[in-house]
């Protein structure tokens, strides 16, 4: 029961961060965006979509627990390319507005 209380507290602490806009503060490169390989995302803004350290009510080990969605304007593309990156909380800051 104690463990489930800890998990519930962890989920409750993360819940207000979901949906908030963030800016990447750490120098980070991602390689999984097909339209922009070797992309430096430092300074980019995105939205926290999910906290992944709790899954089906159990704690899981996630080194990068915040799933953040980004949009990238790519020349020649009518719509921005959407992609996700998993970040640690010390790699981004919350952006007001």
Curated annotation (Swiss-Prot):
It holds the Pfam family FeThRed_A. Keywords: Chloroplast, Oxidoreductase, Plastid. One of its GO terms (molecular function) is oxidoreductase activity. It is found in: Plastid, Chloroplast. GO terms for biological process: photosynthesis. Variable subunit of the ferredoxin-thioredoxin reductase (FTR), which catalyzes the two-electron reduction of thioredoxins by the electrons provided by reduced ferredoxin. This is Ferredoxin-thioredoxin reductase, variable chain. It comes from Zea mays.
């Amino acid at each position: 029961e104690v463990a489930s209380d800890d998990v519930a507290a962890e989920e409750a602490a993360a819940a207000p961060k979901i949906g908030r806009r963030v800016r990447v503060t750490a120098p980070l490169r991602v390689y999984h965006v097909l339209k922009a390989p070797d992309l430096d995302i430092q300074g980019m803004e995105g939205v926290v979509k999910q906290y992944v350290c709790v899954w089906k009510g159990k704690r899981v080990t996630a080194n990068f627990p915040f799933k953040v969605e980004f949009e990238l304007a790519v020349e020649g593309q009518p719509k921005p390319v959407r992609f996700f990156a998993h970040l640690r909380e010390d790699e981004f800051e919350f952006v007001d507005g």
